[in-house]
UniProtKB/Swiss-Prot annotation:
Keywords: Membrane, Phosphoprotein, Transmembrane, Transmembrane helix
Entry annotated with the keyword Phosphoprotein: yes
GO cellular component, one term: membrane
Coiled-coil spans in chain: none
Protein name listed in UniProt: Uncharacterized membrane protein At3g27390
């Protein structure tokens, strides 16, 4: 379906679109009004139960972890223990109120968006799905939200506390300078008093421009079928985006007001880091200019700011080849300059946890190989099933899969991360534009550039793989090196590989704290336990010497089950992955 050409055709298409849009919006509103209280009730009761039931454990374990932490100095321990009561009081209040608000918003808007998504191009039985989509699925996801919240409060919390009690490799720990605290606190208070009013005024003054320019852009894209509405499947959502744009502007203003509080309070951090009260005051003035320049760039206004920007650091930070941020997609100005000739190209749908889903595909594939080599044994699987946990299964195997994801991207000279299908690539240009995904993707891109600069040989890559997989078990690492000859390494090269292994395991531990990862891993352990019980009950005649080792069968069956939300069988997944950019991965 091509976009209309000419003013009359565009106007006719627009008038024809209005009743279609109003009908879908009305239906979505009805479903949202019905489901909003139910979803809000489920999320509020579930999250409140998790918060209140774990609160005593959190209080006791947090104090114990801080007191026994090896990464925190004694003075900082006392300071944190004095600040903890305020955090303990605020946590239930903020958590429960956030659950009420989040549950209500999700219960209302999720059916609306699902209603519009049901009439996308190529969707079968559109009339039925207009009524059905967003009803039962929203209720199911509300229970998933509670489960993910429980994983964060339980698994992720204890994982962070355990890491806090571990000593750093360089034997350093964090400490606080008491003499700098009074000045830093005074600067923070001044920043909170000065920055929020000024930044709020700037945001309010720029909000009308953002409102009308956004409407102009959305109407232009809708009629001319450019930008986000280039694909026909996006057209039904166009009217909803136009209608909700004032809410987006209001949210941007509210977000600016809230963030200005933290921006002003950060002046105390600058004062503490620079050991200077004066530099903290300079940051209070410069932060207004920083916000003004950022908002100017977003709104495609002339560069610069009318506010002064004094120097607030003793020494300018010099960017290093690997310490700087990964380049992101440019501002609206850069994007608008590329809009002149819209080329109708296939749309690549990269979802925020697409890389995480590919990680489990890699784990399944490499798990079979590693089990065949004996690097993964039955003891690892037994520990993964127990509450003790297995470092090799829970951290080593995902880190191994991510390592070869990075190495494959390096060999292909990819600007991002090349997925296992050899076609789909996650870059800073097509990745989801939320800050959460920056935290997810950017560390791996930085590590990829570091490995690319190191120029590893195949023997060094294999050694690094064993190092990543068995880094938490030195004895098994030595035995694996005895079986597979270790390449001749200089002290510098060995130190580099050790640093890469520590970095990979650290990043994997961070990823393992994401709620979705934990849900997948629980399904893995559950299926693992079932397969082991089934194996124990099998007769001796079923254990043929021609069969692959038990860990191979177990890992293969684990990662091929529907618990990983892969549509179709393993072969079906492989065929689907070969379609490259046209695939649409369903990740919950």
């Amino acid at each position: 379906m091509e976009p209309p050409i000419g003013f009359r055709a565009s106007l006719f298409q627009f008038l024809l679109f209005l009743p279609y849009f109003i009908g879908l919006l009305f239906l979505g509103f009805i479903k949202g009004i019905v489901l909003c209280p139910l979803v809000c009730l489920v999320v509020t009761i579930g999250n409140s139960a998790v918060i209140l039931s774990l609160l005593p454990v959190h209080i006791v374990w947090t104090f114990y972890s801080i007191v026994s932490a090896k990464q925190v100095g004694p003075i900082l321990k006392i300071f944190l223990c004095l600040c903890l009561p305020a955090a303990i009081i605020l946590w239930p209040i903020v958590g429960i109120l956030g659950s009420v608000l989040g549950g209500a918003l999700y219960g209302f808007f999720s059916p609306i968006f699902a209603t519009f998504d049901a009439v996308g191009e190529g969707k079968p039985y559109q009339f039925f799905h207009c009524f059905y989509d967003g009803t039962w699925s929203t209720m199911q996801r509300s229970f998933t939200v509670v489960r993910d919240f429980k994983d964060v409060c339980f698994h992720s919390y204890f994982s962070l506390m355990d890491e806090l009690k571990q000593s750093c490799p360089d034997r350093k720990y964090y400490e606080i300078r008491l003499l700098q605290l009074p000045g830093a606190l005074v600067v923070s208070v001044l920043g909170i008093l000065v920055d929020p009013p000024v930044i709020s005024l700037v945001a309010i003054c720029k909000s009308p421009y953002m409102l009308f320019k956004g409407w102009h852009r959305l109407f232009h894209d809708l009629i001319g079928r450019e930008g986000p509405f280039l694909e026909t499947m996006c057209v039904p959502i166009a009217g909803l985006a136009i209608l909700l744009w004032p809410l987006a502007v209001t949210g941007a203003v509210i977000g600016s007001v809230i963030s200005s509080i933290f921006l002003g309070a950060y002046a105390g951090v600058v004062s503490y880091q620079e050991s200077s009260f004066y530099y903290g005051l300079c940051y209070i003035v410069a932060s207004v200019s920083i916000y003004d320049e950022y908002s100017t760039d977003i709104l495609d206004l002339p560069e610069g700011s009318c506010f002064p920007r004094p120097k607030y650091r003793r020494k300018d930070e010099e960017p290093t080849p690997f310490s700087g941020p990964v380049p992101r997609l440019g501002s609206v100005k850069n994007a608008s300059s590329m809009r002149g000739g819209s080329v109708r190209v296939p749309m690549i749908d990269i979802k925020p946890l697409d890389l995480l889903n590919e990680l489990f595909v890699e784990c399944r594939r490499y798990g079979e190989v590693l089990a065949t080599k004996g690097l993964i044994n039955s003891k690892d699987i037994e520990e993964a099933r127990s509450s003790k946990g297995s470092q090799v299964i829970s951290v080593g195997l995902p880190a191994y899969g991510l390592l070869y994801e990075i190495l494959r991207s390096v060999k292909a000279n990819s600007s991002g991360l090349l997925l296992s299908d050899g076609v789909t690539e996650i870059t800073t240009m097509n990745r989801p534009k939320d800050v959460f995904f920056d935290w997810f993707l950017n560390p791996f891109l930085i590590l990829k550039e570091q490995m690319k600069a190191t120029n590893l040989s195949e023997e060094e890559e294999e050694y690094l793989g064993r190092l990543v997989l068995l880094f938490g078990d030195p004895e098994r690492l030595k035995s694996s090196n005895a079986i597979s000859a270790s390449p001749p390494l200089t002290e510098r090269k060995r130190a580099e590989l050790d640093a890469f292994a520590r970095r990979m395991q650290g990043l994997t531990k961070t990823v393992s704290r994401y709620p979705t990862f934990r849900r997948h891993f629980v399904a893995l352990v559950k299926k693992l336990s079932e397969d082991l019980d089934l194996k124990d009950n099998n007769s001796a005649k079923d254990e043929s010497i021609t069969e692959p080792p038990a860990p191979v069968k177990i890992i293969s069956r684990i990662f091929s089950q529907r618990s990983f939300r892969r549509k179709g069988s393993v072969n079906g997944s492989d065929q689907e992955s070969q379609k490259g950019v046209s695939r649409n991965v369903d990740i919950v």
